[in-house]
């Protein structure tokens, strides 16, 4: 699971198409319509992901998405293992802030959270999905509302899920020693 802030932008002026060349011209100027946050969940080996935009990124927003994950996506699963970064909202306390204690406890018992190490967000596979989302859905586009963004996100994750784009992210110790020399020194005794 990961989050991504997004600026909501609209064109300051409408673009136009040249009658003589057929080329479309767009002005670089834009108007900010605020920001929002994309919450992305993924199950890498199953080739599933879902992204939803919320107007803000609060403990309650995170807790509501966790409730959706546990009750809607995995209603029959006893324990869900969630890998996420160390953001201040990504913890069990958020459930207690958002829900009544009995409901928060019910959700907390089904959730096992593993935080990636500091400066280790690359271990969070949702980062890979957010990168794909940025390149395939958000790049070089101006989306002016959370509603429009959610339409685009729904189309993106539906198409990506239908294509069964799974992530099999792994590496061997030898590869880690090559790429992360400062973390995996070779000791000579």
Feature locations, PLM:
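C-terminal domain-tail junction helix/linker
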Residues: 12, 148-189
């Amino acid at each position: 699971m990961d989050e991504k802030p997004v600026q909501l932008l609209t064109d300051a002026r409408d673009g136009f198409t040249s009658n003589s060349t057929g080329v479309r011209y767009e002005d670089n100027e834009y108007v900010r319509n605020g920001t929002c946050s994309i919450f992305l969940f993924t199950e890498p080996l199953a080739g599933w992901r879902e992204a939803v935009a919320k107007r803000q990124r609060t403990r309650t927003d995170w807790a509501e998405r966790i409730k959706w994950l546990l009750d809607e996506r995995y209603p029959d699963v006893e324990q869900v293992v969630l890998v996420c970064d160390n953001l201040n909202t990504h913890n069990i306390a958020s459930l207690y802030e958002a829900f009544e204690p009995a409901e928060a406890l019910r959700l907390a018992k089904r959730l096992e959270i593993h935080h990636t190490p500091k400066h280790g967000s690359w271990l969070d596979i949702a980062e890979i999905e957010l990168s794909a989302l940025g390149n395939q859905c958000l790049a070089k586009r101006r989306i002016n509302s959370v509603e429009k963004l959610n339409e685009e996100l729904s189309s993106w994750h539906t198409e990506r899920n239908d294509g069964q784009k799974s992530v099999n992210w792994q590496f061997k110790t030898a590869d880690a020693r090559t790429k992360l020399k400062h973390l995996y020194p070779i000791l000579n005794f």
